[in-house]
Each structure stands twice: as C-alpha cells, then as structure tokens.
Amino acid sequence: MTESKIAIGTVQFGTNYGVSNKSGVTPVTEVKKIINLAQENNIKYFDTAPVYGESEQVLGKCLNNYGEIITKTISIKNKVISEADIVNIRSEFNRSLKRIKRDSVYALLVHNSNDLTKKGSERLHDELCSLKDEGKIKKIGLSAYTADDIDSVISRYEMDLIQLPVNLFDQRLIHNGYLKSISEKG
C-alpha cells in the first residue's frame, strides 16, 4: 500500500468546531478509532494547532508514536514582529512538543499568512529555519486561504509545503488552475 498524502484534521479532537458540528468535541474513544482507521489505510499525517483546544494533548495521548504531526505557529498580534514575538513562537512550539509527546514534528506551518508579510517577518522565517536546522521540524510551511495570501508569502520566502482550503466541496483553487501553477513552481 502506498503512503497517503491525506492529513486528518484534528480541530474537533480538542474543541467544539464546525458549522454542522452537533456533537461537540470528539470523545477520546472515537479519536482512537479514527487513528486506528487511519493506520489501516496508511494515513499518517495529523494536522493540529495550539489554538485547537485540547487537540495536541489528545494526539499525544492517543497516537502512541504513530504518524507525523503537522502543527502551527501562534498568530503574532503586533504589526511589527519583534524578538519577543519570536521568543513566544519558540516557547509555544516547545509547549506543543510537550503536549504531543514528541521531540520533533513533520511540519510547522505559519497559521496566519499575514505574519510572513509583516515588517520583521524575516525574524519569523529565520526562526523556522533554525528549528529545521535543529531537527525539530522537517518542513516549513504556510496555512493559507487565498491565492493572494500564498503569492504574497512565496514571493518572499521559500516554503516546503502549503496547506490550502481544498476539499471535496471547495475546489476553487483546482478549477481556476492555481494549484497547478504553484505546483509547477516547485
């Protein structure tokens, strides 16, 4: 069986999220079933973030070293990124590692694409590169919602991966040719 590129989104493992979510946070017993089903189907990527409630803790409890974690940075509130913001990013990332019970993760995505276009964004990118050099992350990435967001970041910085809002129901970035064009760029 070939490795799947599908990632399981885990926001509902830790918080009551979603327009059609009528049952609240996914119980741990169900999370374990989802992880078992993922293993049976060679799905090994799990997407989480510090802002997803208890999601990271649930993954740390349930994964038992299976799979690859993709997590995200906290958003930077300031208009100009300072050294203090970078210290906060590093500290929160270290807390994420503790919550998921790992020494490293597959990828760290910048959760708010605007953080990579603000004044001082090179500090954030440099910190991501440092984490990669230290072996704490394998991939540097971006979570984005629009083609403009992606373009504004990749014109400044190289990204190993980009998380896009593409699913069975929302395929705008496929149909308008954008996904193909950025794929061709590498």
Could you describe each region identified by the protein language model?
Residues 1-68:
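N-terminal binding-site loop/beta-alpha segment at the start of enzyme catalytic domains
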Residues 2, 59-69, 97-103, 132, ...:
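Acidic (Asp/Glu)-rich catalytic clusters
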Residues 3-7, 44-45, 68-70, 104-109, ...:
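Structural preference for beta-strand elements that scaffold enzyme active sites
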Residues 11-13, 49-51, 72-76, 110-113, ...:
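Active-site beta-loop-alpha junctions enriched in small/polar residues
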Residues 22-38, 84-101, 144-153:
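Short, acidic/polar
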Residues 47-57, 77-83, 115-119, 168-174:
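Acidic-and-aromatic substrate-binding clefts and catalytic sites of carbohydrate-active enzymes
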Residues 97-116:
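Active-site groove signature of glycoside hydrolases
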Residues 113-186:
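Beta/alpha (TIM)-barrel catalytic core signal, keyed to glycine-rich beta->alpha loops juxtaposed to Asp/Glu
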